[in-house]
Amino acid sequence: MKNNAQLLMPREKMLKFGISALTDVELLALFLRTGTRGKDVLTLAKEMLENFGSLYGLLTSEYEQFSGVHGIGVAKFAQLKGIAELARRYYNVRMREESPLLSPEMTREFLQSQLTGEEREIFMVIFLDSQHRVITHSRIFSGTLNHVEVHPREIIREAIKINASALILAHNHPSGCAEPSKADKLITERIIKSCQFMDLRVLDHIVIGRGEYVSFAERGWI
């Protein structure tokens, strides 16, 4: 009963002020629902965030790290992994229904949901039609911890196949630092030049780090 009483406060706060009013601890407590022996759910949520440093650290943790927290088992690990997957699928659907140019923040959130936590560099392309609506997106290349081989002709071939008119490029830096490298800038220039011959526009290249991003368009590089 104590756990349920403790959980009532975040619920009441959510109903009165909206879900965004909850702290990370309160939001995590809502999902955990119950604490462990001798520890209420709010205390447990607070300790978990302290152990992992942030929600990002928690949601991208492996089971070996997660099970090191006393009293936490596979059920709660599965709950939190389910939350992360729900968010990823939500942005997947939303991307198909909204124009990335009308909601650049949503586009970044989508890319973060797709690429955050990956241990290798992944190069993604969002393919858009002439109205800048999403046709599809693809993890078109994958590489190592700090490098991914990108071939512009493969991107163009896929764009032509699905009749795309514009592209948004994206890749992650598993190191966590989103600052583009010289190689990132060079491959972006190569892709843009190759696309120009086929009347394809590259609208942006977004690099995803740990809790940060860099947009080539916002920097004025595209």
Swiss-Prot record:
Pfam families: RadC (PF04002), UPF0758_N (PF20582). The keyword Zinc applies. One of its GO terms (biological process) is proteolysis. GO terms for molecular function: metal ion binding; metallopeptidase activity. It comes from the Bacteria. SUPFAM superfamilies: RuvA domain 2-like (SSF47781). Zn(2+) binds at H171, H173, D184. Gene3D superfamilies: Cytidine Deaminase, domain 2. Belongs to the UPF0758 family. YicR subfamily. HAMAP family: UPF0758_YicR. This is UPF0758 protein YicR. It comes from Shigella dysenteriae serotype 1 (strain Sd197).
